[in-house]
């Protein structure tokens, strides 16, 4: 079950349905919640704890 965490600019439901948008901001980490839109890059963002 892939859960896509989106940044404040994107909503959860939108990110889940539109994965193409995630690829665009795949390098963008949410500084507030330290989470990335795409789950692949969540590990990278989580490392910055």
Swiss-Prot record:
Q: Which UniProt keywords apply?
A: Chromosome, Developmental protein, Differentiation, DNA condensation, DNA-binding, Nucleosome core, Nucleus, Spermatogenesis
Cross-referenced Pfam families: Protamine_P1
What the entry lists under InterPro entries is as follows:
Protamine_P1 (IPR000221)
Subcellular location(s) of the protein = Nucleus; Chromosome
List, alphabetically, the GO terms of the cellular component aspect: nucleosome; nucleus
Is the keyword Cytoplasm in the record?
Answer: no
Q: Name one GO biological process term.
A: sperm DNA condensation
Instruction: Select a single GO molecular function from the record's annotations and give it.
Output: DNA binding
KW Cytoplasm (keyword) present: no
Q: In which tissues is it expressed?
A: Testis.
Task of the protein: Protamines substitute for histones in the chromatin of sperm during the haploid phase of spermatogenesis. They compact sperm DNA into a highly condensed, stable and inactive complex.
Q: What is this protein called?
A: Sperm protamine P1
Q: Which family does it belong to?
A: Belongs to the protamine P1 family.
């Amino acid at each position: 079950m892939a859960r896509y965490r989106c940044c404040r600019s994107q909503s959860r439901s939108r990110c889940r349905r539109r994965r193409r948008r995630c690829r665009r901001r795949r390098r963008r980490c949410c500084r507030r919640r330290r989470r990335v839109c795409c789950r692949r890059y969540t590990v990278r963002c989580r490392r910055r704890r």
